[in-house]
């Protein structure tokens, strides 16, 4: 059986990679969305590890809610990105600071 420490280290590594990805890729909004999804995956990994370690089902149920919210976030985020690309011709985050009235 794999100890819970290994799962927590995996969660920390995934969270750290996503945090570095968010810091380094400030221009591309699609990469920002992917990094946020990776961050949610890291949190889910920790919830599953603690849920299995303490023999509680609550953490696993909470993961399903997080996955549902993450899927909705990804769908809405990609729809907004497609509309921005269609209207403006690029998906550069720096050029999205102008709002139309």
Curated annotation (Swiss-Prot):
Could you say which enzyme class this protein belongs to?
translocase
- Give me the reactions it catalyses: a quinone + NADH + 5 H(+)(in) = a quinol + NAD(+) + 4 H(+)(out)
Which topology term describes how it sits in the membrane?
Multi-pass membrane protein
Localization per Swiss-Prot or TrEMBL: Cell inner membrane
UniProt GO cellular component terms: NADH dehydrogenase complex; plasma membrane
Under Gene Ontology molecular function, one entry of this record is: NADH:ubiquinone reductase (non-electrogenic) activity
* Function (record text): NDH-1 shuttles electrons from NADH, via FMN and iron-sulfur (Fe-S) centers, to quinones in the respiratory chain. The immediate electron acceptor for the enzyme in this species is believed to be ubiquinone. Couples the redox reaction to proton translocation (for every two electrons transferred, four hydrogen ions are translocated across the cytoplasmic membrane), and thus conserves the redox energy in a proton gradient.
List the PANTHER family hit by this protein, alphabetically.
NADH DEHYDROGENASE SUBUNIT 4L-RELATED, NADH-UBIQUINONE OXIDOREDUCTASE SUBUNIT ND4L
Family in the record: Belongs to the complex I subunit 4L family.
Q: What is this protein called?
A: NADH-quinone oxidoreductase subunit K
Q: Which organism is this entry from?
A: Legionella pneumophila subsp. pneumophila (strain Philadelphia 1 / ATCC 33152 / DSM 7513)
């Amino acid at each position: 059986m794999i100890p819970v420490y290994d799962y927590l280290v995996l969660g920390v590594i995934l969270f750290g990679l996503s945090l570095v990805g968010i810091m380094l890729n400030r221009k591309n909004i699609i990469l920002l969305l992917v990094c946020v999804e990776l961050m949610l995956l890291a949190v889910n990994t920790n919830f599953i590890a603690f849920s299995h370690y303490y023999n509680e089902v609550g953490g696993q149920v909470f993961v399903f809610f997080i996955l549902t919210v993450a899927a909705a976030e990804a769908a809405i985020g990609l729809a907004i990105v497609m509309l921005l690309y269609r209207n403006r011709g690029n998906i550069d985050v720096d050029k999205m600071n102008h709002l139309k009235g």
